[in-house]
Amino acid sequence: MSKSENLYSAARELIPGGVNSPVRAFTGVGGTPLFIEKADGAYLYDVDGKAYIDYVGSWGPMVLGHNHPAIRNAVIEAAERGLSFGAPTEMEVKMAQLVTELVPTMDMVRMVNSGTEATMSAIRLARGFTGRDKIIKFEGCYHGHADCLLVKAGSGALTLGQPNSPGVPADFAKHTLTCTYNDLASVRAAFEQYPQEIACIIIEPVAGNMNCVPPLPDFLPGLRALCDEFGALLIIDEVMTGFRVALAGAQDYYGVEPDLTCLGKIIGGGMPVGAFGGRRDVMDALAPTGPVYQAGTLSGNPIAMAAGFACLNEVAQPGVHETLDELTTRLAEGLLEAAEEAGIPLVVNHVGGMFGIFFTDAESVTCYQDVMACDVERFKRFFHMMLDEGVYLAPSAFEAGFMSVAHSMEDINNTIDAARRVFAKL
């Protein structure tokens, strides 16, 4: 047995499923998950000593690559001053200043510890601010594991074939209206059915938890217009897209202004950080200045803030997003060319530093139904064959891939060459 197999066997006796987040168990592709010993740049190294070109990037945060020296040094320096204080620090102020400068729609920001905390808190705030209970989310989108959001959720819920999670009371779920991504008519129908009851829409601007599905041109502006018409707030969940699709996020890339924004992943530079923020009048409703309660023992943790501050300063440097786009475009085009040579029907969506691979005869993939029609069994074989080639893709047909600026064009070309060999045998 390999070291990964031995560790996985031991882990399953101690940790449910052997992992601390379901998708890591390779449930979506079968087999034994890799146990990782270290990572550097664009590469992961497993406990058995094998190296992989990494397109998971810790599920998005590693936009600069693994073990970036600026982030590593910031963490070491912060740790030497203490691990946690439970009191305000200067770095929290500096971090808030930087985030609000980089994302102009965020007049104010509140730091939390995860993307789930960010979305959960933003929805509570929207409900408290509007005095309404219902929310709209979209089929196949995932916004963390808060009870009100595990209704036809994407990500692991799709992989496990569970559109709803046991343990979510029906009384919670009834306030969550699920519409079709990229379908404005379904959203208007929901508003017309409950014109005075909907507090907010929450949306992944690029759906990254049913692989990678970008919005159609009129979709996000249409959501903004419907929120304005019916007095609801628009929450854009940029946990995945923030600082990746563009410096100011997908909202800037697509030209839509939300009332609230949720951030995670890149904002922590690899540490557990989330944030939500937006209009000043809405944020003023948060405790302690307002009646909507939200709190966290480790929110604004000094080490996490130092990591995030270092990461965002690096991400804000000229050329970062142009490089991400160039690398991702080359990968997407190369995969399509290789698939066509082998007669494999393939769609590759990509935006900025995100991409998605779909085995399908369809010309495009634009919604949950399109994603579910793709050939998952072929993806499973593709995943394992690419893994054998030293390429680590997301171990699920329903998860996006992530590029970093640490990837070289040689890495991309080697990945395309590996895919060409795999397609010939697929």
UniProtKB/Swiss-Prot annotation:
What is any one GO biological process for this UniProt entry?
protoporphyrinogen IX biosynthetic process
EC number in record: 5.4.3.8
- Primary localization class, coarse: cytoplasm
**What does UniProt give as GO cellular component?**
cytoplasm
What reaction does this catalyse? (S)-4-amino-5-oxopentanoate = 5-aminolevulinate
Domain of life per record? Bacteria
Q: What class of enzyme is it?
A: isomerase
Which cofactor does the UniProt annotation name?
pyridoxal 5'-phosphate
Q: Which UniProt keywords apply?
A: Cytoplasm, Isomerase, Porphyrin biosynthesis, Pyridoxal phosphate
Gene Ontology terms, MF aspect: glutamate-1-semialdehyde 2,1-aminomutase activity; pyridoxal phosphate binding; transaminase activity
InterPro entries in alphabetical order = 4pyrrol_synth_GluAld_NH2Trfase, Aminotrans_3, Aminotrans_3_PPA_site, PyrdxlP-dep_Trfase, PyrdxlP-dep_Trfase_major, PyrdxlP-dep_Trfase_small
Spell out the subcellular localization from the entry: Cytoplasm
Carrying N6-(pyridoxal phosphate)lysine, the residues are: 265
Pathways involved: Porphyrin-containing compound metabolism; protoporphyrin-IX biosynthesis; 5-aminolevulinate from L-glutamyl-tRNA(Glu): step 2/2
The family classification in the record reads: Belongs to the class-III pyridoxal-phosphate-dependent aminotransferase family. HemL subfamily.
Q: How does it assemble?
A: Homodimer.
Report what the protein is called. Answer: Glutamate-1-semialdehyde 2,1-aminomutase
* Source organism (scientific name): Shigella sonnei (strain Ss046)
Lineage per the UniProt record: Bacteria, Pseudomonadati, Pseudomonadota, Gammaproteobacteria, Enterobacterales
